[in-house]
Amino acid sequence: MQSDIEICRNTPLSSIDVIAEKAGLLPEEFDTHGKYKAKVHPKCLARLNDNQNGKLVLVTAITPTPLGEGKTVTTIGLAQGLAKLKQSVMACIRQPSMGPVFGIKGGAAGGGYSQVAPMEELNLHLTGDIHAVTAAHNLASAALDARLFHEQREGYDAFEARTGLKALKIDVESITWKRVMDHNDRALRMVKIGLNEHGKTINGFERNEGFDISAASELMAIIALAKNLKDLRQRIGKIVVAYDLDGQPITTEDLQVAGAMAVTLKEAIAPTLMQTLEGVPTLIHAGPFANIAHGNSSIIADEIALKLSRYTVTEAGFGSDMGFEKACNIKAAAANKAPDCVVIVATLRGLKANSGHYDLRPGMAIPDSIFSPDQAALVAGFENLKWHIKNVHKYGIPAVVAINQFPQDCEQELTALQDLIHAFDPNVKVAISTAFAQGGEGTRDLAQYVVDACEKTTNFRPLYQKHQSLQEKLMSVCEAGYGATNVEMSELATKQLAHFEKLGFNELAVCIAKTPLSVTTDSSVKGAPVGFTVPIRELRLCAGAGFVYALSGSVMTMPGLPDKPAFMNLDLDEDGNIIGLS
């Protein structure tokens, strides 16, 4: 079989003008970026306001292996399958970060015959939104350090007298705003800045600093959750970057940098329109990771797609304990729209990996032995799929299971898995998906089951309500969302929680950063564990995004590269074509 990039290059594509017209957009509602990309103006929603909303289909998964189980392939394949059924459909996915593209997972355009194209344009830079996020974020960092420098160098009274500005009196030890970059670089997790020659302060004042990956920036979450430019601007102004000497928050508005940050992000609030290999219009917008952020594409992209099509197919990062939980408890609340149907992607290899019979860790190749028939491992790993089915039903949303088939899969085991699902819950429809090998043709059954599920009545139930305390919200996600029996707050996290509640941030949502490789915070614990504790080591306030960010276990907000990163496979041929991207 051809590689993903070869399939993409050998498939004729329509110009983006044709795709935009197919989606129902007017020429003045988008700006082309080359032949196959366009920025869609959010203002088109004013014209579409009276259109009835379509159905929102959210794709999630079992607890994945480090290489993923094919959510994006299934998302794109399902959208193409719905088109095969003559349904009006659009897909919405996140913009890939170059961190994973050059790191372990590679690209995020789908694969095989279920891709967004051109895949190299999607995976590398796209229309520059992540670079804009990085620039706007680091502008706030520069503004903060500049203000700190001038106030401390001159003294507060002299600074106020000279500038006419009120001294912010920044507590250096309280600075929470790290810098960001769109690469995996563990060496930047902890750094010192403001270093000078002896006796000089020309470079600023020395302090500890660190970098997060751009996908973890609060600005990325804000772009994904903002409804329009006005909302974007207001949210940016609420970002807390530090505290003053009295413990009061200092915001980007206080630094008078929020307006410039919004200017930097003016174009980034517009989703990018592309197409699948079968010509399904696809909106790509925002790229928050689900393990260290809220893991869903933007509300604006969803709203445009829901107004233009009968079905909008989107995905949430990692398993249903990760991006799906945050879609239900953060995104749905901000958008006032919950999914009408959820597709849970499962694979034979993923379930066997959850059996505890295999040791799969990031950077390791998937062993061929995992594809050999192993009924005991399949049955043991099935507990994980049961967990995710029950988890989706907990929110009152109909679920459909898609078994993403690999070429090496054993037919007997595929049948056995379907039997296990039917025996567990006869009301849950299950379809074999061959989206990778066959595109939309390989998801016809899945697409029909999704159409049927979308006609069912939903009884959406988030895990917590806005009025509950932050402590109650954290407990709800850990206990009801993960199945933990206890939440263990560090001394630091306990102090931070009390501080946030004292400052009046009690009504914010909670976003827990944890490993995606287990329902627990320990990546080595597989299956459907019970009776575990969730350790919360630190809280971060994301007042602009609208949530408190809890770091659990040993999760890092700046990933590192493996010993054999994906960038080793990338190069250019003599004609300038990219090779080795997958």
Curated annotation (Swiss-Prot):
- Pathway assigned in UniProt: One-carbon metabolism; tetrahydrofolate interconversion
Q: Which GO biological process categories is it annotated with?
A: tetrahydrofolate interconversion
Residues the entry annotates as binding ATP: 65-72
Which GO MF terms are attached to this record? ATP binding; formate-tetrahydrofolate ligase activity
Pfam families xrefs: FTHFS (PF01268)
Q: What class of enzyme is it?
A: ligase
Has UniProt tagged this entry with the keyword GTP-binding?
no
Keyword terms: ATP-binding, Ligase, Nucleotide-binding, One-carbon metabolism
> Might you give the EC number(s) for this enzyme?
6.3.4.3
Among InterPro entries, the record links this protein to: Formate_THF_ligase, Formate_THF_ligase_CS, P-loop_NTPase
Catalysis: reaction(s):
(6S)-5,6,7,8-tetrahydrofolate + formate + ATP = (6R)-10-formyltetrahydrofolate + ADP + phosphate
Family, per entry: Belongs to the formate--tetrahydrofolate ligase family.
**Entry's HAMAP family?**
FTHFS
What is this protein's record name? Formate--tetrahydrofolate ligase
Lineage summary: Bacteria, Pseudomonadati, Pseudomonadota, Gammaproteobacteria, Vibrionales
